[in-house]
Amino acid sequence: GDVYKRQALTEIPGSSSVLSRGFVTYSNQSKIDMLGVRLKTLELHGAVSGQTVSEMASGAITASNGEADYAIAVSGVAGPDGGNKEKPVGLVYICILKKGEVGEIKKYIFRGDRHSVRYQTVMKALDNLTQLV
């Protein structure tokens, strides 16, 4: 999802004035190393959870060294593999965080193939962001 979001944003002329940076953190270790997600959060709730995206968004704000006013964090099961009864393919958590405020976490279950789930995630994340800005 992160790559699609950056592509969607960077297609707009002048986007470099509003997009500071992005993080691709597929592995749990990268979430810990790059965004400061706590190991305990990952152990208790898993990578695909509201708690994890909340910590990811907070970590992105911190990692921006004061440059970012907003952070978008996404984690999900895009498929075709990786889903189970508790966390099916299509499950996505999105957190939009404004610096200094509590993040808004939303849970979605999207339908379709991997590309479709990722596309729907990007569109929903950007829609959620525009509602807050």
Positions of PLM-derived features:
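Oxyanion-binding "anion nests"
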Residues: 1
